[in-house]
Design a protein with these regions (language model features):
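Short, small-residue-biased leader/transition segments that mark boundaries at the very start
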Residues: 2-9
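Disordered propeptide/prodomain
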Residues: 10-103, 244-248
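Aspartic protease catalytic domain
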Residues: 20-57, 170-171, 314-380
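Signature of the N-terminal lobe/flap region of pepsin-like aspartyl proteases
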Residues: 75, 83-169, 289, 312-316
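Short hydrophobic beta-strand that contains or immediately precedes a catalytic carboxylate
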Residues: 93-95, 102-107, 113-115, 267-271, ...
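Cytochrome P450 catalytic domain signature, combining two hallmark sequence patches
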Residues: 119-134, 201-204, 243-245, 284-300
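Aspartic protease core domain of the pepsin/retropepsin superfamily
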Residues: 158-249, 338-380
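Extracytoplasmic, non-cytosolic globular domains
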Residues: 265-308
């Protein structure tokens, strides 16, 4: 069958000197405390407001993911955004010659590779090339600016040359690991880079015989969490892959899902966000239907679920015809006493659902750039 032939092709390439696919391990820090859910919402609004502004500036059209007036008003009213606790899934990449190791957040909700100056020094890389192009934009709570270089980049054994890298002039203050590796589609609307060089996955595809332009996330709290690049590792899977329809969004990875029977259309799958969120009233409607969940309203009007830690609710997503139950670890955003906080809440000013990393813990999630489709399978 197809699975066997794919494995056969992959296995036959193992002994060859180039890497057709590679796997790295991802790590995850402990869950944040409940207070940081507010910071998470704000970070997410800032992130997508930044995209919306760039989209408008480059196309003259409005990106309807967020209400820009609301996002700007929130930013002005609050001054400094509370720091998010670093609870991302991160992995290490190698940059430059000789290679410099940098921990990064792999972010399917953005498109550029930006590195903290503490982890990448282009002056120490023989292969770095200054593209003489500055970058300057907002990303989550950060004002990110600096110069764009091109250099060698490797994820495990899959390498690419002349990959554009934003070299930040300041450190990221703990709001990101050492940088962020954007994995959404690179378009003028969502990229902060005005350069012609290909992002990593396209450069790797052109320069190496990788099996497919794909990333496969298998996020496990217990056991090894992995990111496979360049092919699907079927040994990670405990069942068939269900493929979602072709993604027609030019910029973001989107899919329609059902959450406990509630239809959610065209949600953005964003591994760089730590929660599942959406329009405030829509999220409340879903929370109201979950057995064992108390719906709490914050002073700012947003809703979040709370539950007894001894009796976590059953959250299940149906995507591409297959149903996945989220683990009790995935749905837990922190606790106070014997009450746990659900990693799902509403966000005012947000018009679309954002399915963050808790959603991606449902099993193995594949992002295939060649077909513009996402695949979902249960993990071993």
């Amino acid at each position: 069958g197809l699975v066997g032939s794919e494995m056969c092709i992959r296995d036959s390439l193992v002994g060859v000197s180039f890497a057709s696919a590679s796997q790295i391990t991802l790590s995850h820090t402990d869950r944040s405390n409940p207070d940081s859910f507010h910071a998470e919402r704000r970070s997410l609004l800032n992130k997508y407001a930044g995209f919306a502004k760039r989209h408008f500036n480059s196309t003259g059209q409005h990106l309807d993911i967020v209400d820009l007036h609301y996002a700007d008003k929130q930013k002005r009213a609050s001054g400094k955004t509370p720091l998010r606790y670093n609870t991302y899934w991160t992995g290490s990449i190698l940059v430059g010659s000789p290679p410099q190791a940098a921990p990064v957040v792999f972010d399917t909700g953005s498109s550029d590779l930006i590195l903290d100056k503490s982890f990448y020094n282009p002056k120490k890389s023989l292969s770095a090339n200054n593209l003489n192009t500055p970058f300057d934009f907002s990303y989550i709570n950060l004002h990110v600016y600096g110069d764009i270089y091109s250099d060698h980049v490797a994820i495990g054994d899959v390498k690419a040359d002349n990959v554009p890298i934003g070299h930040g002039r300041e450190d990221f203050d703990g709001d990101l690991a050492g940088g962020k590796f954007g994995l959404s589609f690179s378009t003028a609307e969502n990229s902060g880079f005005d350069v012609k060089q290909d992002p990593f996955i396209w450069a790797a595809k052109k320069q190496n015989p990788i099996q497919s332009s794909s990333f496969q996330f298998t996020l496990r709290r217990s056991g090894k969490a992995t990111l496979n690049v360049g092919d699907v590792d079927h040994s990670e899977l405990a069942g068939p892959i269900s493929w979602a329809d072709e993604n027609t969004d030019k910029t973001f990875w989107r899919t329609s899902v059902e959450l406990n029977g509630n239809k959610i259309e065209n949600a953005i799958v964003d591994s760089g966000t730590n929660v599942i969120t959406g329009p405030n009233d829509q999220v409340k409607a879903v929370l109201d239907q979950l057995d064992g969940v108390w719906v709490e309203q914050s002073p700012d009007g947003t809703y979040q679920g709370r539950y007894s830690c001894q009796n976590p609710p059953n959250l299940h997503f149906t995507v591409a015809g297959q149903t996945f139950k989220l683990s009790s670890d995935a749905i837990n955003f922190g606790y106070a006493g014997d009450k746990c906080f659900l990693a799902m809440g509403g966000t005012l000013g947000l018009n679309d659902w954002i399915l963050g990393s808790p959603f991606m813990e449902l099993g193995s999630v594949i992002f295939n750039y060649d077909t513009r489709r996402m695949g979902f399978a249960k993990a071993r």
